Regions:
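Alpha-helical adaptor scaffolds
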Residues: 86-89, 110, 123-126, 130, ...
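Structural signature of tandem alpha-helical TPR/SEL1-like repeats
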Residues: 27-32, 62-71, 98-108, 135-144, ...
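Canonical positions in the second alpha-helix
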Residues: 37-39, 74-75, 111-112, 147-148, ...
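Hydrophobic face of amphipathic alpha-helices that form TPR/SEL1-like repeat modules
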Residues: 50-57, 86-94, 123-130, 159-166, ...
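Terminal, low-structured helical/coil segments at or just beyond the last alpha-helical repeat
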Residues: 27-31, 207-254
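N-terminal leader/linker segments that initiate helical-solenoid repeat arrays
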Residues: 9, 16, 21-56, 254
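Short helix-capping/linker turns of helical repeat alpha-solenoids
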Residues: 41-44, 57-59, 77-80, 94-95, ...
């Protein structure tokens, strides 16, 4: 399989690493659990979120999945969009003792996304792209990826780059795809680093530069992206001669 077919295949997979943490800098992390609980019971949405996280992780208190789910729900109901996002993922998987419910998960994501929560926007984009609980709608996927990418969420920038590279839900635009991969790589997204290496190798959206291709493959490999290590080995074995573009045909679906 040639470099960009690998790139596109891998980059189109759902959940390319965990979405960027989106917790508010509200000082709650420095408080003891007892104080967080006091604030949560007094109605503070962010404190409810902090309590839920502590109960889920078992940090600073004994882990209690059922109570964690309760407080995520409480935080979500009081307008904490990070809580809506996390609760959506839990409900989608049926985690923490919650009943799996795709419809409820989508409603929670939609609520958070419509209020500008970038990870929710990105995840909705993935669900539209893959027909996960809804009909496939590539244009909607692009729209949601763009909203999240505009907020500099690296995983969304990478996902949008793949859509632009492949012409999915939008016109194919190698220049814009390169820009998205570049921005996502600056945001430390490992898959984007791999994809940027591929763009430099092929000369897509930029001047061909095998040294930069190797540089970004190495950066991605250092982040644990296995395919990037293979790309480095392949480049060395090809004596710096990339595969012809005509052989690069990526699948239409992840």
């Amino acid at each position: 399989m040639s470099v960009l077919s690998r790139i596109s295949l891998v980059a189109l997979c759902l959940l390319l690493g965990n979405p960027t943490a989106y917790a508010a800098d509200n000082g709650l992390e420095q408080l003891p659990f007892v104080k967080k609980m006091q604030l949560a019971k007094a109605g503070d949405p962010d404190a409810k979120m902090a309590v839920a996280q502590a109960l889920e992780s078992g940090i600073d208190t004994k882990a209690d999945p059922a109570m964690a789910a309760k407080w995520y729900r409480e935080a979500a109901l009081t307008g904490n969009y990070e809580a809506q996002y996390r609760l959506a993922k839990l409900v989608d998987k049926g985690a923490l003792g919650l009943k799996a419910d795709k419809s409820t998960a989508i409603k929670l994501l939609d609520s958070a996304a419509k209020h500008g929560h970038a990870p929710s926007e990105n995840l909705l984009g993935q669900m539209f792209q893959n027909g996960d609980g809804m009909s496939v709608d590539l244009k909607a996927a692009v729209e949601w990826y763009k909203k999240a990418a505009d907020q500099k969420l690296a995983v969304a920038q990478n996902n949008l780059g793949v859509m632009l590279l492949k012409g999915l839900g939008t016109d194919r635009n190698l220049d814009e795809a390169f820009k998205m991969f570049d921005q996502a790589a600056q945001g430390e997204d490992g898959w984007a680093m791999n994809n940027l290496g591929g763009m430099y190798e092929m000369g897509w959206g930029t001047k061909k530069d095998l040294d930069k291709a190797k540089l970004f493959y190495q950066k991605a490999a250092d982040k644990g992206i296995a395919i990037s290590t293979k790309n480095l080995v392949r480049l060395a074995s090809l004596s710096a001669t990339p595969a012809p573009a005509s052989t690069i045909v990526a699948p239409s679906k992840p």
